[in-house]
């Protein structure tokens, strides 16, 4: 198999990266790959702690796709076993553990979602429970002997918790070792991860060396800042744009980012080559509004068709530029003629909880037939005549009693 030249590959592989450990070893591995015609084995792990992937995950997935396009082997690890431990990276307290059923259920759609970026025909997918689940307690003891508590406490998050007398469970020490066993089992050449995964990646590198395997090169990628412009993207923080969001929701959420994120999102989320990326980078400072609209369109097109991206833009303009309600809103009918507004919002899925519903009402984010409602104790009276409920900027519902159609 023939590969692009060393420099061509390095230009693509090193773009947007934070750290490569080590660059010299990466060059050696690429040169050996070119000489032998054997592709590099490039690994990316994802613990299915939640069922949805978001744009933050796409940063490392896109780097894995770049390796694919260069002719290398992409290995996507679904960490169904390690998810039952819980990754402590960046956490100030112990993360809740998932059951085996929850981990498998969440992981079931990961490959389908990741395939919106990866070439599914050139991707090897593995579940680490297939090998970690077969380890005996004696195997775990032997594995633990390869690493010391002192080394574990070099992690910033562990050190902070230790200094502040916050509890650290033994199973959290086992997490990086379990993830490192993935690298031992697969004998991969390269591992990708966000900057918060650096310690885990290095443990994999060390453990490969302990087992007599040529150590992997570790490549870390930036953590994508969420839509609010401050914290890293996280669904739990409510600042995420998910792969499975509706095109109109995805478009609107991208447009909600502060102008200061346009360049960063463009560099991290769009392919290295392409007219859209180039146009955004050249013009965002002079005309951020136009650049952001193009960015939103380009991002939606990665997960949906160009036609759906165009329809999402038209939907946004109709709602927020021309101030028109959506032309088609599904009608939901209720058997009760009167319902507390808080219950109505949670039942419709407009609010994640009653607390969230009260917050929305108090922040003037809820209206019925264009009339703002600010009293959290409001009771809504329904009839056969549908009412239009608006929650937040983009959620519309038509509601009525379960009478005549």
UniProtKB/Swiss-Prot annotation:
Major location (coarse): cytoplasm
InterPro entries named in the record: aa-tRNA-synth_Ic, Rossmann-like_a/b/a_fold, S4_RNA-bd_sf, SYY-like_C, Tyr-tRNA-ligase, Tyr-tRNA-ligase_bac-type, Tyr-tRNA-ligase_bac_2
UniProt KW Cytoplasm keyword: yes
Domain spans labelled S4 RNA-binding: 339-400
GO MF: ATP binding; RNA binding; tyrosine-tRNA ligase activity
Enzyme Commission designation: 6.1.1.1
Motif 'HIGH' region: positions: 48-57
Keyword Nucleotide-binding: yes
Motif ('KMSKS' region): 232-236
Record keywords: Aminoacyl-tRNA synthetase, ATP-binding, Cytoplasm, Ligase, Nucleotide-binding, Protein biosynthesis, RNA-binding
Cross-referenced Pfam families: SYY_C-terminal, tRNA-synt_1b
Sequence positions that bind ATP: 235
UniProt feature coiled coil, ranges: none
Any one GO CC term of the record: cytosol
Catalytic activity reported: tRNA(Tyr) + L-tyrosine + ATP = L-tyrosyl-tRNA(Tyr) + AMP + diphosphate + H(+)
PROSITE patterns: S4
SUPFAM superfamilies: Alpha-L RNA-binding motif, Nucleotidylyl transferase
Record-stated family: Belongs to the class-I aminoacyl-tRNA synthetase family. TyrS type 2 subfamily.
Free-text function comment from the UniProt entry: Catalyzes the attachment of tyrosine to tRNA(Tyr) in a two-step reaction: tyrosine is first activated by ATP to form Tyr-AMP and then transferred to the acceptor end of tRNA(Tyr).
HAMAP family: Tyr_tRNA_synth_type2
Protein name per the record: Tyrosine--tRNA ligase
Organism name: Chlorobium luteolum (strain DSM 273 / BCRC 81028 / 2530) (Pelodictyon luteolum)
Lineage: Bacteria, Pseudomonadati, Chlorobiota, Chlorobiia, Chlorobiales
């Amino acid at each position: 198999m023939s590969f692009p030249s060393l420099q061509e590959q390095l230009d693509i592989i090193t773009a947007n990266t934070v750290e490569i450990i080590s660059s010299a070893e990466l060059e050696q591995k690429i040169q050996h790959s070119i000489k032998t015609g054997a592709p590099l084995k490039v690994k990316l792990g994802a613990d299915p702690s939640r069922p949805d992937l978001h744009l933050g995950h796409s940063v490392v997935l896109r780097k894995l796709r770049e390796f694919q396009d260069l002719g290398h082997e992409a290995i996507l690890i679904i960490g169904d076993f390690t998810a039952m431990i819980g990754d402590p990276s960046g956490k100030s307290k112990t993360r809740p553990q998932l059951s085996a059923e929850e981990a498998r259920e969440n992981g079931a759609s990961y490959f389908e979602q990741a395939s919106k970026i990866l070439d599914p025909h050139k991707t090897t997918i593995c579940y680490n429970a297939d090998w970690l689940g077969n380890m005996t307690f004696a195997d775990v003891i032997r594995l633990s002997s390869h690493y010391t508590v002192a080394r574990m406490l070099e992690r910033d998050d562990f050190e902070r918790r230790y200094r502040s007398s916050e509890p650290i469970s033994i199973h959290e020490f086992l997490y990086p070792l379990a993830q490192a066993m993935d690298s031992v089992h697969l004998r991969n050449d390269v591992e990708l991860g966000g900057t918060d995964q650096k310690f885990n990646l290095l443990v994999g590198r060390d453990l490969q060396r302990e087992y007599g395997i040529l150590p992997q090169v570790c490549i870390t990628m930036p953590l994508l800042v969420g839509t609010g412009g401050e914290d890293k993207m996280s669904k739990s923080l409510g600042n995420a744009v998910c792969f499975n969001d509706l095109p109109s929701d995805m478009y609107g959420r991208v447009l909600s980012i502060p102008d200061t994120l346009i360049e960063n999102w463009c560099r991290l989320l769009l392919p290295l080559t392409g007219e859209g990326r180039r146009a955004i980078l050249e013009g965002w400072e002079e005309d951020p509004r136009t650049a952001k609209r193009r960015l939103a369109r380009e991002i939606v097109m990665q997960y949906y068709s160009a036609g759906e991206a165009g329809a999402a833009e038209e939907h946004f303009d109709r709602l927020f530029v021309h101030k028109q309600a959506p032309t088609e809103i599904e009608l939901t009918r209720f058997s009760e003629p009167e319902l507390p507004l808080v219950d109505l919002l949670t039942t419709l899925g407009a609010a994640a909880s009653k607390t969230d519903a009260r917050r929305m009402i108090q922040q003037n984010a809820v209206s019925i037939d264009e009339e703002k409602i600010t009293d959290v104790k409001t009771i809504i009276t329904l009839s056969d005549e549908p009412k239009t409920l608006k929650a937040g900027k983009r959620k519309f519902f038509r509601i009525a009693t379960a009478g005549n159609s």
